[in-house]
Curated annotation (Swiss-Prot):
Catalytic reaction annotation: (2-aminoethyl)phosphonate + pyruvate = phosphonoacetaldehyde + L-alanine
Protein name as it appears in the record: 2-aminoethylphosphonate--pyruvate transaminase
Keyword Transferase among record annotations: yes
Function: Involved in phosphonate degradation.
Keywords assigned by UniProt, alphabetized: Aminotransferase, Pyridoxal phosphate, Pyruvate, Transferase
Length: 344
């Protein structure tokens, strides 16, 4: 097997440490007590990263990509008579809308341009006009562009109007400090292969216990039933209902230890932030402009606008890959861009 020397300048999967890779050499049994104890430690560590009020929250691990965990939340927490307001300004907000529609859940959309943050004024207007809305969902860092959405304001509004709050923090959790109790987030979703710097294979939901308990019997899918998954893990000491990605869990546990060793989320944020600023400055020197205004830019990934003349993305991609760097193609619908990630 050829050793991979590429540095992934992407928003996840990303470049992992040698020590994270090495723990995946060994095989583990899903029924083993030592393994299940590790699962419980992972669940507890995630809650402690998310809030100081740990007793109010719990973690559910879910096999698959981060999208599986998002769909588990959408399909499990909204009752048959519920309605969700989705704030969208990119591919991942739109994906939540698609999920709701596929699951035949009533959905209202607050949409802004991909380079603009969620419009709080419009969100409040929709909440005032539509009393049937029960839940509100927003993407924290929209990976499409690297824009940060105002989750503090969105969640505050949500609670002001008595709604359940859902935050897709796929590309921000572990890289940007968040206290979900302070922000009044009921369900936060992220993935193993993002800012905590593990490998792909499972996502996780950090849920307010009181709200999660209301989800019993509401799941619209067997394998993506969030409550049933939690209940099994809770009552059977970390057991998953179906085969779990044992190697990925071990890699994630190691990645959590390395996050702690680095100095925690604040230290990691500072590293990402400094790298992102350096990247934008150096790219600016050779004529590349970022899509998102600095005020709304996350340190996770930066979208750069194609120069108007003489630019071929595939040529840039191939040349960078030849030198050992892999970047991210653009996913913007109205503007030609490419992305460079700072995580990993």
């Amino acid at each position: 097997m050829t050793e991979n020397h590429y540095l992934l300048l992407t928003p996840g999967p990303l470049t992992t440490t040698k020590s994270v890779k090495e723990v995946m050499i060994y095989d583990w049994c899903t029924w083993d007590d030592e393994y299940n104890t590790m699962v419980q430690e992972v669940r507890a560590k995630l809650v402690s990263l998310a809030t100081k009020e740990e007793e109010k929250y719990t973690t559910v691990l879910m096999q698959g990509s981060g999208t599986f965990s998002v769909e588990a939340v959408i399909g499990s927490v909204i009752p048959a008579n519920g309605k969700i307001l989705v704030c969208t300004n990119g591919a991942y907000g739109k994906r939540i809308v698609q999920m709701a529609e596929m699951l035949q859940i009533d959905v209202v959309v607050s949409q802004t341009e991909e380079w603009e943050p969620t419009n709080i004024v419009e969100v409040e207007k929709l909440l005032q006009e539509d009393k049937e809305i029960t839940h509100i969902a927003v993407v924290h860092c929209e990976t499409t562009t690297g824009i940060i959405n105002p989750i503090v304001d969105v969640c505050k509004l949500g609670k002001q109007y008595g709604k359940v709050t859902i935050v897709d923090a796929m590309s921000s959790f572990g890289g940007i400090e968040i206290d979900i109790a302070d922000l009044q987030i009921d369900f936060l979703i992220s993935s193993a292969n993002k800012c905590i710097q593990g490998v792909p294979g499972f996502g996780f939901v950090i849920a307010k216990r009181d709200e999660l308990l209301k989800c019993k019997g509401q799941g619209r899918s067997l394998s993506l039933d969030l409550y049933d998954q939690w209940e099994t893990m809770e009552k059977q000491n970390g057991k998953w209902r179906f085969t779990s990605p044992t190697h990925v869990v071990h890699a994630f546990y190691q990645a959590l230890l390395e996050l702690q060793k680095e100095g925690g989320v604040r230290a990691r944020y500072n590293r990402y932030y400094n790298n992102q600023k350096l990247l934008v400055n150096r790219m600016g020197e050779i004529g590349f402009k970022p899509l998102v205004d600095e005020e709304y830019q996350a340190p996770i990934i930066t979208s750069f606008i194609y120069p108007k003349q003489g630019f071929e993305f595939q040529q840039l991609y191939n040349e960078l890959k030849r030198y050992g760097f892999v970047i991210y193609p653009g996913k913007i619908s109205k503007v030609d861009t490419f992305g460079i990630g700072n995580i990993g």
